[in-house]
Amino acid sequence: MKVFIDSGDIAEIKEAQSMGVVDGVTTNPSLLAKAGKPTKRAIAEICEVVDGPVSAEVVAVEKDAILREGRELAKIHRNVVVKVPLIDEGLKAARIFASEGIKTNVTLCFSAAQALLAAKAGATYVSPFVGRVDDAAGDGMDLVLQVVTIFRNYGFSTQVLTASIRHPVHFVQAAMIGSHAATMPLKVIKQLTRHPLTDVGLAQFLADAKKIPELV
């Protein structure tokens, strides 16, 4: 499963990249606003750091406007993936982007039916939001399972990019289900490296190492 970092902060992205585990980046207007840089500049900088897909989101809800913004974003770098909302107009735009060779990440997916339509429209990725589904008293991982199963049943090339991952359990469950990729903030990536027994074992090894006689 590919690991993406969900961030617009170049320092966070570089830190995650230094671990050698990051395959791509997802951003959204909220994350880029926190970075305090113009969108095109921020995306260009991210593309210089990570040699993988970088999702950049349009801020439009009408097909022609989505197409205009998306085409401009796609010009920034060959790795840019245009994020479009999972609405009627977004699907119309995704279909045209696909015909133009522009990769898309159809985002804000909350049902398997939505995901199926996104795949039929030619989306490169579809992003089911597991954490937000859980917040609404649903089962986010069951949604991912449904989407993965449907895509396998019908041989869709669209990849499942599990989003809104809140903790390591979400990450492991997504991998077990067969999600193609998962995106998460740096905080969760760091949580994945930690385990209390690792800390205990390391502390013991370091303590025992001090007992080894030094060679003269």
UniProtKB/Swiss-Prot annotation:
BP GO annotations: carbohydrate metabolic process; pentose-phosphate shunt
This enzyme's EC code(s): 2.2.1.2
InterPro entries: Aldolase_TIM, TAL/FSA, Transaldolase_3B, Transaldolase_3B/F6P_aldolase, Transaldolase_AS, TSA/FSA_arc/bac
Main enzyme class: transferase
Subcellular location: Cytoplasm
SUPFAM superfamilies per record: Aldolase
A GO cellular component entry from the record: cytoplasm
Domain of life: Bacteria
Family label: Belongs to the transaldolase family. Type 3B subfamily.
Function (record text): Transaldolase is important for the balance of metabolites in the pentose-phosphate pathway.
Protein name in UniProt: Probable transaldolase
Native organism: Sorangium cellulosum (strain So ce56) (Polyangium cellulosum (strain So ce56))
Gene coding for it: tal
